[in-house]
Each structure stands twice: as structure tokens, then as C-alpha cells.
């Protein structure tokens, strides 16, 4: 229990087909989606290179985040979610006032319903994007950031 006597109760939901889906949103628009395949006994669902710990100590000083030979990531594949799921992810991001990031969901094995369980205000773009999703999302991200940086600031006094 927290100092204010609040508590968070979590329930484990088994993911149908042993996978979760991450939808990336950029500027309120669908960028791409991937399915992350779950490994038995693991909970690390991050598709980026730097997220998966190994049994051996690692030095990240010499590790490139775009190294295609790394084993420090969960197995992923491109995915095309239904339009309604994409719209749900867009609405979640808009309601959260997040312009760049991802929404993760799973289909529950027991009831077949989708559960949105993670909202990320920072994109962990998939490693090897051209191979996985067919394009490199970083130029789109850079263009978006530059366009936002060039917008005049609204100052309220």
C-alpha cells in the first residue's frame, strides 16, 4: 500500500498466439505496427536492441543500436492491425496528448478481447526497420520534430 493507502492490482492476461502488438503513432497518424513474440518465462517485450538483458555483462559504450547482429531484442514481425484497433490507438494517444509513441495491446487468450496495457510517450523503434516493416521510420520522426520546432510558440500571459 502506498502512503495514501492506494494500491494497484494487476492481473496476468495470457496473450493469444503468444504475442503482443505494438502500434507506433507519429503526429496523430499510424506509422507502423509490429507483433512481438513472447518467450517462455520472460516479460521483456521491448523490440529495440538495448532493451533485452543478457546473462553476460554488457558494455553499451561500443554497442550500436542499429546492429543487425545483436541478440538483445525480442523476436518481432510486421503486423497489420484492423482499422478499428489503429483508430483506438490514435484516440488513446490523442487523449493522452502524446504526439509520438506507441500503444501496446494483446488479445486475451481466455475471452478474445483486446486489452491496451501500455502507452509509451517515446518510440522504441523496431531494430532493422527496413527488414521488419519495410521502411526506416527515423526520417519521418526527424521531419516531424523539425516541423514542430519551426512552429511558433503560443505564450499565454
Which residues are covered by each model-predicted region?
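C-terminal active-site "lid" helix and adjoining low-complexity regulatory extension at the edge
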Residues: 79-80, 94-98, 107-157
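Hydrophobic residue at the +6 position relative to the catalytic HRD Asp in the kinase catalytic loop
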Residues: 103-105
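Phosphate-binding site of ATP-dependent enzymes
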Residues: 1-96
Amino acid at each position: 500500500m502506498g502512503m495514501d493507502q492506494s494500491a494497484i492490482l494487476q492481473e496476468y492476461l495470457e496473450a493469444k498466439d503468444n504475442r503482443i502488438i505494438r502500434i507506433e503513432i507519429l503526429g496523430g497518424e499510424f506509422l507502423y505496427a509490429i507483433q512481438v513474440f513472447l518467450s517462455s518465462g520472460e516479460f521483456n517485450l521491448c523490440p529495440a536492441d538495448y532493451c533485452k538483458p543478457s546473462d553476460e555483462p554488457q558494455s553499451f559504450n561500443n554497442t550500436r543500436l542499429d546492429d543487425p547482429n545483436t541478440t538483445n531484442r525480442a523476436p518481432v514481425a510486421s503486423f497489420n492491425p484492423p482499422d478499428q484497433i489503429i483508430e483506438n490507438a490514435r484516440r488513446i494517444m490523442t487523449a493522452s496528448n502524446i504526439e509520438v509513441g506507441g500503444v501496446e495491446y494483446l488479445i486475451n487468450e481466455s475471452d478474445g478481447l483486446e486489452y491496451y496495457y501500455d502507452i509509451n510517450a517515446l518510440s522504441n523503434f523496431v531494430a532493422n526497420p527496413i527488414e521488419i516493416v519495410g521502411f526506416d521510420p527515423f526520417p519521418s520522426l526527424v521531419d516531424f520534430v523539425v516541423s514542430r520546432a519551426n512552429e511558433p510558440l503560443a505564450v499565454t500571459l
